[in-house]
Every structure is written in structure tokens, then in C-alpha cells.
């Protein structure tokens, strides 16, 4: 099944503590979750690892967010949108449902 949201897509957060924020998708996990740049930041207590040169302390990092809690951003309308699929020239492409423009 093709992914409606992919890496480097710009998304809007629909629910949670970062609701309304816009950011790019850094990673898509196979569990149906996404890691979005600067969204859902959590503080992780990191042990020092001198072999890898990692300092210890409290580190802020992005936690995964459920894919259903984000929507792809449509730059033409400036709003959140839904994605559909269609075939053009024998290739499967993604398009925005509101205005039928192709997702870049």
C-alpha cells in the first residue's frame, strides 16, 4: 500500500500539544507513526558513552507522532488537505483532494 505521507512532506499537526504547527517529516516508521522535525519534543535522560563520544545529560529529541494526528499541507490553498492517488502516464501519483494538484 502506498504511503499518503512521505519523508520531506510538509505537514500540519491536527491534535496534541503541538496542534497547528507546520513542519517537515523527518522519518516514516513502519508502525504508522512519523517523526516530524521540531514536533513532539521530549526530554530523554542520556547516559554518557565515552567510546562513542556521547556526553551524558538531558537531551531533547523528537518522539514519534501518530500519522492520523497530522495532515499534509497544501501550499496552494494554505490549509491542511487529504491525499488521493491516480495514474498519470502509467505512473501512480499523489494529488491533493481539494484542488487536484499533484503533490511535489
From Swiss-Prot:
Lipoprotein as UniProt keyword: no
Which UniProt keywords are listed?
Ribonucleoprotein, Ribosomal protein, RNA-binding, rRNA-binding
**Which Gene3D superfamilies does the entry mention?**
2.30.30.30
A GO biological-process term: translation
Determine the domain of life of the protein's source. Bacteria
CDD domains, per the entry: KOW_RPL26
Write out the GO cellular component annotations. Answer: ribonucleoprotein complex; ribosome
Gene Ontology MF: a single term: rRNA binding
InterPro entries tied to this protein: KOW, Rib_uL2_dom2, Ribosomal_uL24, Ribosomal_uL24_KOW, Translation_prot_SH3-like_sf
Assembly information from the UniProt record: Part of the 50S ribosomal subunit.
Question: Which NCBIfam families has this protein been placed in?
Answer: rplX_bact
Q: What does this protein do?
A: One of two assembly initiator proteins, it binds directly to the 5'-end of the 23S rRNA, where it nucleates assembly of the 50S subunit.
Family per similarity comment:
Belongs to the universal ribosomal protein uL24 family.
Protein's name in the database? Large ribosomal subunit protein uL24
What phylogenetic lineage does the species belong to? Bacteria, Pseudomonadati, Pseudomonadota, Gammaproteobacteria, Alteromonadales
Amino acid at each position: 500500500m502506498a504511503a499518503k505521507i512521505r519523508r520531506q512532506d510538509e505537514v500540519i499537526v491536527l491534535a496534541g500539544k503541538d496542534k497547528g504547527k507546520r513542519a517537515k517529516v523527518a522519518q516514516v516508521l513502519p508502525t504508522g507513526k512519523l517523526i516530524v522535525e521540531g514536533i513532539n519534543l521530549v526530554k530523554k535522560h542520556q547516559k554518557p558513552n565515552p567510546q562513542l563520544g556521547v556526553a551524558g545529560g538531558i537531551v531533547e529529541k523528537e518522539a514519534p507522532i501518530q500519522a492520523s494526528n497530522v495532515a499534509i499541507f497544501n501550499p496552494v490553498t494554505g490549509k491542511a488537505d487529504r491525499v488521493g492517488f491516480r495514474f498519470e502516464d502509467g505512473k501512480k501519483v499523489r494529488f491533493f483532494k481539494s484542488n487536484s494538484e499533484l503533490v511535489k
